[in-house]
Amino acid sequence: MRILLLGKDGQVGWELQRSLVPLGELIALGRQETDLEDLDALRRCVRAHRPEVIVNAAAYTAVDKAEAEPEKAQRINAGAVDVLAEEANRANAWLVHYSTDYVFDGKKSSAYREDDPTGPLSVYGKTKLEGEQCIRQHHAKHLIFRTSWVYGARGGNFAKTILRLAKEKDELNIIADQHGAPTSAELIADVTALALYRISQSESHATLAGTYHLVAGGETTWHGFARHLLELVRARDVELKVQPENVRPIPTEAYPLPAKRPQNSRMDTAKLSNTFSLHLTNWRYHVQRLVDELVSQTAK
């Protein structure tokens, strides 16, 4: 299997470099090698490498900044994806793409299923949904993984920001009325590799194509995520300035941001679990692994 990975230096891309290697020949490219805003160059890149699988882990993810530069977000999250879908179809290659809970408006009272109506609230969400639609329009052999609240040991994310602030501040105010599942880049990468392996071994692999919700098990709030993370760090004797009682819950309206977020980011993963025979571990498991990794790095 010849795999072209785009976005190798991001949180998910970094983990994909590890998980995809056993599947065959991996060509991993980052921003320096491939500029997703240059659509002609992107097309030439795909044709030059002649992949059997394209894994697109590159995206415009600055949710609030996208409100001020929608054209750039659209070009990367939709325009570039449109090119990838066309080229995957031309080469009869599989295309793996990552989307987001932000394609939903968050008003549903229960977990979102893959076939629920979408209704993005932000430029970021709208461009990610447009990218999904480009893939479905151009190419049948695809996997679209919608995920949420992504974190990892590499790159910037909520978990690492909270750890930094907990060492600097006496008090933290964290949003407590948005619900979802913190999902590690490690889990996303491992599930991607397993899905591609199953496809490679299946005689009816076309039936496995489609959109799947890929998030960790369980649910929490941003406040619950932060509290649990800091409890684990404190248990490892890491000195924190903020005390547990000073990690305070606040409503969304108390922390206004340029881009609106869905209050309900819970996603039903039954389709993914049943199709690929997977057990998606509770979100706390991978948070523990993150803490272990970060603490061990600090100790070196």
Where are these predicted regions, by residue range?
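Amphipathic terminal alpha-helices
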Residues: 281-300
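SDR active-site strand-loop-helix element
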Residues: 6, 29, 54-58, 95-100, ...
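NAD(P)-dependent short-chain dehydrogenase/reductase
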Residues: 136-194
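Catalytic helix-loop patch of NAD(P)-dependent Rossmann-fold dehydrogenases
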Residues: 75, 79-83, 90, 103-145, ...
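NAD(P)H-binding glycine-rich loop region in Rossmannoid oxidoreductase-like domains
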Residues: 39-78
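Mid/C-terminal beta-alpha module of Rossmann-like enzyme folds, strongest
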Residues: 191-192, 198-256
